Amino acid sequence: MTSSENSSVSNPLRTDVLIVGAGPVGLFAAFEAGVIGLSCQIVDGIERPGGQCIELYPDKPIYDIPAVPSCTARDLVDRLVEQCRPFNPPMHLGQRIERLDPLEGGRWLARTDKGHTFDAAAILIAAGNGAFVPQRLALDEAARLEGRYVHYRVSDMNGLAGTNVVVAGGGDSALDWALALRSVARHVTLVHRRSGFSATDSSVARLRQAVAAGEMDFVVGTIARLNSPVGPLESIEVRQIGGSVCLDADQLLVLYGLVADLGPIVNWGIAIQAGRIVVDTSYYESSRPGIFAAGDIACYPNKQKLILCGFHEASLALRKAYNYAFPDKKRVHVHSSYDAKLAERVAAVHP
């Protein structure tokens, strides 16, 4: 469902609803949009669907999804993606909406940071707590070296081949990448502020086994200085209790996790309270007609940050969005059990 469609300011992709966010609520919204006869496009800053479920706790259990006694966040996302398949909603991943401008007739023109544009009758913001951005290393020299010697993600592991790599962090991503890079790097050292980790038991066990076998090093401490006297990174000073240690390093991979950031949403002219979008409780519409919010980003009295609540909010929001997409057409409600068109679509992908 990942889209390769291109668009420009002069030739935007036209859709009934633009869904901002590909987390569980955004994915269910895409399915629900198809059920009631709305076309949609999905945009998300992360390069894979799933939102914070995938980025923060992919293997943690979830117990409060109706009729699903237990599943991991990864399982839930996989099921929601599968549920969308009958409508094949295009997903524009790895980019975020930078601008949102009103058009004549009540429609909206949205622009992403990659130059893609969308002409939508309604906007449904299901962005969780906002876009996720890497938590950066708080050293002045880190900003100067970012992109060449300091990295917050790995786009091509072979780009680190033959180098001394220091990986900073203690979560699943840090441990998994430190272990994976053994196959291409000259040497790998993992640096974490304490001896314990916030990673799965299996990842921790693999790490300790690799260190014991001499396949990589693990150093407890915090990065205090990046040494690059003639340009390239040469070494990293790690502060420890009672002293410090200097590590040879050509490349630094910082995996301190992700932090939520509303980003450009705050500039869209919609009412925001405590970092969330204020909505009514009839259709979860914001202070600007045609812009809706569902999921954790929605703010209203007695709001519960539950995935199932987000499903409900998105469902109602889309029914109001239908009126913006088809102002002269009355929507006829049909229970899914008696929806022949839906049954045909589902049968086509799940024979």
UniProtKB/Swiss-Prot annotation:
Gene Ontology molecular function, alphabetical: ferredoxin-NADP+ reductase activity; flavin adenine dinucleotide binding; NADP binding
Family: Belongs to the ferredoxin--NADP reductase type 2 family.
Pfam families (UniProt xref): Pyr_redox_2
Cofactor(s) this protein cannot do without: FAD
Alphabetized UniProt keyword annotations: FAD, Flavoprotein, NADP, Oxidoreductase
Catalytic activity: 2 reduced [2Fe-2S]-[ferredoxin] + NADP(+) + H(+) = 2 oxidized [2Fe-2S]-[ferredoxin] + NADPH
Binding-site list for FAD: 44, 52, 57, 97, 132, 296, 337
Gene3D superfamilies: FAD/NAD(P)-binding domain
Enzyme class: oxidoreductase
Protein name: Ferredoxin--NADP reductase
SUPFAM superfamilies: FAD/NAD(P)-binding domain
Domain of life: Bacteria
Cofactor note: Binds 1 FAD per subunit.
EC numbers on record: 1.18.1.2
Assembly information from the UniProt record: Homodimer.
